[in-house]
Amino acid sequence: MAKETPIQNTFDGGELSPLLGGRTDLAKYFNGCSVLENFLPAVQGPLVRRGGTQFINAKKTAEQGWLVRFQVSERVAYMLEFGDQYIRFYTDRGLLVDGGSPVEVATPYTTADLTAEDGTCAIRVVQSADVMYIFHGRFQTRKLQRLSATSFSLDLAEFTEGPFDDVNTDESVTVTTDAETGPVNLTASADIFLPEHVGTLFYLETADLSAVRPWGVYQTMSVGQRRRVDNRVYQCTTVGPTNSEGAPVTGNQTPIHTEGKAWDGDGRPITGDQRGSIGVEWEFLHAGYGIVKITAVTDGQHATGTVVKRLPSELQPGGGGSTTVTDFPISSMAPGSSSSRIEVSAPGHPFLDGNPIVITGTILFDSDGMGSNTNRNGSYIVRDRGANSYEIDASWPGPSYVYSPSSNGKATRTITVTYPSNAPTWKWAFSLFSDDTGWPEHGAFWRERLVLVRGRKVAMSVTGDFENFANKSAGGEVEADSGIVVTLNARQVNRAVWVVESDDLVIGTDGDEWLVGPIQSNQAVGPANIRADRRTAYGSRSIQPVEIGSKILFIQASGRRLRDYEYSYDTNNYVSVDTTKLASHMLRTGAVDMAYQQEPDSIVWVARADGQLVGCTYDQETGRSDVYAWHPHPMINGAVEAVETMPAPDGSADDLWMIVRREIDGQTVRYVELLRPPLGDNEDQAEAFYVDCGLTYRGDPAATISGLGHLEGQEVDILTDGAAHPRRTVSGGQVSLQIEASIVHVGLPTSCAAATMSLEAGAANGTAQGKLKRLTNVIARLYRSLGGNLGPTRDNTETLNFRRPSRPMGSPPPLFSGDTEPIPWRGGYERSARIWYTNDQPLPVTLLALLSVVSTNDDR
């Protein structure tokens, strides 16, 4: 009979699939376990018992909810509890209160809204400092703002100038308007408007600007006329004075402004050039398009709205028009150049020859006192214009009449410019997101842009202006920093389910994975420098991935695989590894939530659809480390429904938060709980926290522990000053102790268990599998541990003894480091030998190695 002394000194293979029970050819067979419960495989190799869960607070309502991290900085972070139309806040491992009341904001999301059809969270968020955008496919995007340490607000995110869907291409479906600014009526030639469009933006662009003549140098110009430069349309608001050489003309400085007014010359004449003053003032009107916010829909062809970006008058059926009224005072009147003319003195007046004017307020009186006062009020045409006077067609009443100093005479010019009739425009577009098409489901900050994603559409804001989605500049040009809309075009109509910002924007859909980035990598991302490439076809579940170093880890579409995703320079493409390949049973019921805990160990935590919490210790460094060890964490009377991480208050580690469903005192409750870290090397034994849904009493020695109403009627484990205490049942929110204690941890019992794979050792001829073998001298190598059992099966174990005769019976044995004494092995000869370690006391365990002597009979 051959004899061997094997050692399993690393457990970083985690719990392996039962399908690997015969794969002794795999290296991880010797690092893995057939059973691994409530242990954390450390990247260094040992198994460390997980800490217990600390009760933080009962969820506001008993319905399902979700957790979201709001991290302002490394030391300022909040955990958000999303529930039935509310958000609650946690910080410093407790509920955030202000004035004795929980800090809370109201939301539109009901319990049903918060959970997607596949059981995952329907909410996505993206954060920048004190602002968090909240996305839900059925609700307009919200903006959560941190106003102070205890004050938050939730408002609609009002995106400006877009984003818009594709511009209509059916020239038979047109839209007209009846105003350029303010309230406006929209009339369509077909049924295009829906009640769901109310509150969204509507884009209109002129199909034809030929009615507006191009601006040119030295064009005769009058107030009210319009000209265009490219697609920019301007209106003349002021001209220079008319002189004897001609009327005012445009200058030689092409208008380029896109707001307000500017002159194209200095407005002064040049003697001898046969022109009037050179240069007029231009007001910028529009760049060939405008935007309306729809306020009401009458029917499919009629809607009303408010203009938020001036509309071109060319969108109006009659072409629109403008009216300019100019008043100018009259200083005096006198006989004119003929008996049928009167000269009107008005220094600096703006009127031109031929202008119609209306004169009011004049008084002519007879200086001899013989005649009655009269006037020359009425409508006239300006004649023989001069810089300081002009004439009108009227006769002077007599040689003794003069213009009265008490007159309030003035002349009023009214110029109405009517533009040619226009064809209705077919260039219109609805908002990309609305109650009709749905709202953004995902977001990201990438390349100084806010990215909104829904379905196959990806919209990007103006660079550096996160809420502005204008796809053109104010002058109508598409520029490098303009807003962008990209469509993920593929054979299948797959829906985006996650977005991760990296060098490229990585988008996972339910059928494939995409990269969105610049065509020319040495140039800025812009409308003319953007690409969307389909790279792989794994497909994903709607769970936000986690990032570990340069890798992205996502749940595959079935919910039963966790894949890592990383760019490979060898293949010039992204490559993926199925981390559940060796533990395919671990996500068998499907994942519903996921979080990453970077410190103290690199662990991906997953909440399964059946309420099981599982983890994957992940440490991948090419040529150095190849750890992806899965480990389940069953709970007594507990189903984990949501997980999230945030930095611990002291920043030394990441805390895993969870919402746990439990049955307490005959009622279904949901608690917010926090996974406590294992006992640290610098912590006293009394600080060991290995109970679930637990609380800690710390104070003067006490024999009764109260404040346990959240565990009413439950049998609980107790650790008193580092010693395991007999279990008690909570009654009236309290338990009684056998002896007084100063540090007491009370909570639901937990247990841990680890079982090796079928041992492959001791055979002199070939494999040991299937051969009779016997184990003796089984030893556990432990570090700062206490309690536990060893045996051939879970239910057939021998208790390890750590109490020494020199230790007083009234005090707990100290934590043990070293090799346990060999125990009587309860197993006999067997063909599939395993070593089990179990511990059902609330005590710390770090299992470094399992050692044994294996005698194998080679006769089979």
Located regions from the model:
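N-terminal beta-propeller domains
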Residues: M1-P102, K143, L147-P183, T306, ...
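Short linear interaction motifs
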Residues: L47-R50, T61-E63, S101-Q127, D178-N185, ...
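Elongated alpha-helical scaffolds
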Residues: Y78, F82, T107-K143, I507-G508
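Short, surface-exposed beta-strand/strand-loop-strand elements in extracellular ectodomains
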Residues: Y86-Y90, L515, I519, G787-R804
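Beta-sheet-dominated scaffold domains
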Residues: T120-V125, G443, R449, K457, ...
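Glycine/proline-rich low-complexity spacer/linker segments in large multi-domain proteins
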Residues: T750-G788, P792-L800, A849-L850, T856-R860
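Small/polar beta-strand repeat architecture
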Residues: E4-G21, A27, S101-I123, F159-A179, ...
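Beta-sandwich interaction modules
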Residues: P108-V126, G438-W439, S736-Q738, S806-P842, ...
